[in-house]
Amino acid sequence: MFRTRVADEQIWSAIEHICFYLLLPALIVRTLSRANLTSVPVLDFMLVLVSAIAGMSFLLILMHRLLRSRYPDSGPTFSSLFQGATRFHGFVALAIIGPLYGDHGITLTALALAIMVPVLNIANVIVLTIYGSNNSVANGRQILFRIITNPLIIACVVGLTLNWTGMPDIIFNTIDIVGNGGLGLTLLAVGAGLRLDQIAEDKLLVTVGVLIRLIGMPLMVIAIASLIGLEGLPRTVAIIAGAVPTAASAY
């Protein structure tokens, strides 16, 4: 649809913003507010995701030495590789898991967002501060601001709060109507945002980043989940969260 210009780029940008700031948060709030969280192994789920991020971050830092031989000014290059290999696209994760596993899958995906987004924001800003250019440096206040203003994180907090306090049916039904349009429009927005003809100049670096993100990260999750003993749908959701493409912010 984007290629045929049925709608121009500004409309697709508006759709993406509506999904990110309204539809997907509504979907998360609706799901978490009525979810049975007692059946979710939260600690094991969190341990798998955080350990996978930490393990991949450590391996990437070791790879920085290999980059020095090819890239004299390897700091900014490494920070770009690190972002592309560790960040994940929450839109795509929700769009895949929702239709496959229903509300329970969305609940686990929302928890994955609540766990991974703060950890990844902190890790990536630290790497940018150490390895990136001076223009990339961000202080602790900026990191905190990015986390607490993320609509998906806010939705997780609101949904978990309503799960504890309860929510009137009329409000739930309204949020349900809004959230139901989220997944379909999200898939359209993700597809319209693909720019296969604008691959970065350094194809080797792009290839390495893609392989780490799409193959290395899910393998890391599988290995850690096996060690910890995470099974069933939580394991599946963790693997999918590790296997989806990098977030748009990584670009």
In which residue ranges do the predicted regions lie?
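Alpha-helical transmembrane segments of multi-pass small-molecule/ion transporters
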Residues: M1-Y251
